[in-house]
């Protein structure tokens, strides 16, 4: 009978220990979820900035090419008119 009581006490202690471990794991999991969410938001902002930079560079390239083409055409026309 005494052995059964000791076993029950031991089981209750193990149960408390398991509950504490589970609680710790749940808190850790919650922190990880928050960190993942923060990283996801940061990646989204980086993606938005990258898109803006790509558009700016593309616009600059198109402007440069347009200037070169128009300048070349004007030079050709000027030389034709001059001669």
Curated annotation (Swiss-Prot):
GO terms for cellular component: host cell plasma membrane; membrane. It is a single-pass membrane protein. The keyword Membrane applies. It is found in: Host cell inner membrane. GO terms for biological process: killing of cells of another organism. Residues 1-45 form a coiled coil. The chain crosses the membrane at residues 57-77. It holds the Pfam family XhlA. The keyword Cell inner membrane does not apply. It comes from the Viruses. Probably functions as a holin together with holin-like protein 26. Accumulates harmlessly in the cytoplasmic membrane until it reaches a critical concentration that triggers the formation of micron-scale pores (holes) causing host cell membrane disruption and endolysin escape into the periplasmic space. Determines the precise timing of host cell lysis. This is Holin-like protein 24.1. It comes from Bacillus phage SPP1 (Bacteriophage SPP1). The gene is 24.1.
């Amino acid at each position: 009978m005494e052995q059964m009581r000791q076993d029950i006490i031991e089981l209750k202690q193990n149960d408390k220990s398991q509950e504490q471990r589970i609680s710790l794991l749940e808190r850790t999991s919650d922190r990880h979820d928050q960190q993942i969410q923060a990283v996801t938001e940061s990646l989204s902002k980086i993606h938005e900035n990258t898109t803006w930079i790509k558009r700016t560079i593309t616009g600059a390239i198109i402007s440069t090419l347009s200037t070169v083409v128009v300048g070349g055409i004007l030079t050709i026309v000027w030389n034709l008119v001059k001669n």
